[in-house]
């Protein structure tokens, strides 16, 4: 197996990344440079070590300073030490990290997209200045606490409470499946006040009554990123830690609309990795006296996989253009997330089939991408929830209740 694995790895490394419709030609020099440096990081720093961390369900802390050195945290945010890159460049960052590993991409996406994104969208200028520069340098890690044990898809019904007091708020409740929670320096907690209004509160590491230590490890996807259940028992939050412009659940929705686009890009990264692995494997694996790439059944699978990858790439590029023009709607983001997650899961499964039994081994990476895609399909709104958002948009009728 080692000889075959070495040949497949060499073939993947030597081949150009999948770009069948020559989308690379549409990138600016800046976008291409960002893509190239993140790809180099993913190939040289993430890919060689990630299987071991994934298998042990441990987070690769050694990568944090290397991610910081890339200078991409905060992606599209202007100022505050953030790069202010284009929406397309931000998508390429997510795609390239995910091509190597979904866990590392989730760590980055939660920190940069959900935590920093919420502060940027919902915070005052003073709050942005207070937190974003250190987060851009990854000196402080962020997390985003919305999902609860009893409320996943129905997150609008959240039960975590924020009770007013003279100098701030007291938070009580539980959050679950919170990425980065156990290692974060600050967690944005969405909670409901006495008037029923939903707001966002920045809880800092070490706050009395704040316990993010219940790490969820017995999972089969995204094993190298730590997700946890958070307990909040009479956690005191100063008034200045309530984000100034987070006043309703719609503000959480604004954040998720943006990050769903990121999940669509992530799906492309997983699909590209699996297609490229299957193509290389088919060229190296011989059965019945010739490479299996020469058989009609395998070529049919590869052609279908390439079609799915290319369609997902095109959808992401157009979505980024619409977002740059401030014309992207929540339903557009949902459609991209739904479609790309569906097709990426299909590509990963087809790649596993092309690799046969070897597709189940971590060594070939496909199995890791396949199980990680189950997580992508679930978080930031399941396939079914995205379909209801799109359905409501095209029919004018809500099927949520």
Across the structure, where does each feature detected by a protein language model lie?
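A structural signal for short hydrophobic beta-strand segments in well-ordered beta-sheet cores
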Residues: 160-163
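Glycine-rich phosphate/cofactor-binding loops in nucleotide/flavin-utilizing enzymes
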Residues: 2-23, 93, 114, 126, ...
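Hydrophobic, small-residue-rich alpha-helical packing segments that form membrane-like cores
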Residues: 153-154, 169
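A short core secondary-structure module
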Residues: 172-213
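C-terminal helix-coil-helix/basic helical segment that borders enzyme active sites and/or dimer interfaces
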Residues: 47-55, 279, 283-290, 306-339, ...
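A short, Trp-centered hydrophobic/proline-enriched beta-strand micro-motif
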Residues: 138-146
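Glycine-rich beta->alpha junctions and the first turn(s) of the following alpha-helix
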Residues: 23-27, 212-310, 376, 385, ...
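Internal helix-loop-helix
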Residues: 69-139, 179-186, 323-326, 368-371
